[in-house]
A protein has these predicted regions:
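Short, charged, low-complexity amphipathic alpha-helix
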Residues: 1-23
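Serine/threonine-rich low-complexity intrinsically disordered regions
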Residues: 8, 13-16, 38, 89, ...
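Anionic-ligand-binding alpha/beta catalytic cores of soluble enzymes and soluble regulatory domains
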Residues: 17, 27, 31
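Phosphate-interacting basic helix/loop segments used at nucleotide- and nucleic-acid interfaces
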Residues: 30-46
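Short linear sequence elements within intrinsically disordered, low-complexity coil regions
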Residues: 35, 42, 63-66, 113
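Domain-scale macromolecular recognition modules
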Residues: 45-108
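Short acidic DE-rich linear segments
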Residues: 108-114
């Protein structure tokens, strides 16, 4: 009878390592997807009086009353609290380009705790 202890130990160790990596990748993708959804929900629910154009860059601000406004005016040209810069993709999704001093956790809570 062959001693298969080394084969079994090495095999299960390799499986655990690969599955742990796969789960970490799934978790990272899940968090990124939730954040992407939250940003789009925030931008689409903000106030704006124009139809955003695919490929253009826009700026999200927060008023003192807590409401959000989407604008074509850059942060160095306006007085409102700058939240983020977004760009509208061909899928009509707002892609986050940069974020101001307000963190995602402040805006949406902590998705890592999900």
């Amino acid at each position: 009878p062959n001693d298969l202890t080394n084969f079994k130990t090495t095999g299960i160790s390799r499986v655990e390592k690969e599955l742990r990596l796969k789960l970490e990748n799934i978790k990272t993708e899940y968090i990124e997807t939730i954040n992407h959804y939250n940003w789009n929900k925030l931008v689409y629910s903000s106030e704006y009086a124009f139809e955003p154009v695919i490929g253009n860059t826009y700026y999200l601000y927060r008023r003192s009353n807590g409401t959000h406004i989407l604008s074509m005016i850059s942060p160095d040209e306006w007085y409102l609290e700058y939240i983020a810069t977004v760009k509208l993709s061909v899928e009509k999704q707002f892609e986050l380009q940069s974020i101001g001093a307000t963190s995602e956790a402040e805006l949406f809570g902590n998705p890592n705790g999900v």
